[in-house]
Amino acid sequence: MKTSFNKYGRKDGKDLCEIVLENDHGMIVKVLNYGATLEKVLLNDENMILSLNSPADYSQERNYLGGTVGRIAGRVRKGQWRHGLETHQLPINDGENHIHGGIGTDTEVWDFKPSCSENSARVDLTLLD
């Protein structure tokens, strides 16, 4: 198992990185910290998912390929939810509703921490408010 990362640019003073996870059987997964985007899943050098040509292309295209759904998967009616007696208002981004975590998580630069062990390779991505 192996992890590495390559810097390919900057946004808002932060490095844009392609994180590479590899196993011992020829599988390679590439994730971008730009939008926590699943960029490629390679098996024997064949990409198993639809991808753009380069990491930099993801900041130019708004097609959501490999995109991570925000903190909420699905639609929240009128962007409101209740926790106990308190009502919370979320940003509206789908008519009068909130959908898939709100506006812009796909264009944020996420913090990342790759790690590996004898049996696994992983990356943790975090987006702080």
Swiss-Prot record:
GO biological process, one term: glucose metabolic process
EC number: 5.1.3.3
Keywords: Carbohydrate metabolism, Isomerase
GO molecular function: aldose 1-epimerase activity; carbohydrate binding
Domain of life: Bacteria
Keyword Plastid: no
SUPFAM superfamilies noted in UniProt: Galactose mutarotase-like
InterPro entries assigned: Aldose_1/G6P_1-epimerase (IPR008183), Gal_mutarotase_sf_dom (IPR011013), GH-type_carb-bd (IPR014718)
Pfam family, one: Aldose_epim
Reaction(s) the record says it catalyses: alpha-D-glucose = beta-D-glucose
Keyword Isomerase: yes
Pathway as given in its UniProt record: Carbohydrate metabolism; hexose metabolism
UniProt family annotation: Belongs to the aldose epimerase family.
Purpose: Mutarotase converts alpha-aldose to the beta-anomer. It is active on D-glucose, L-arabinose, D-xylose, D-galactose, maltose and lactose.
Record-given protein name: Aldose 1-epimerase
Gene designation per UniProt: galM
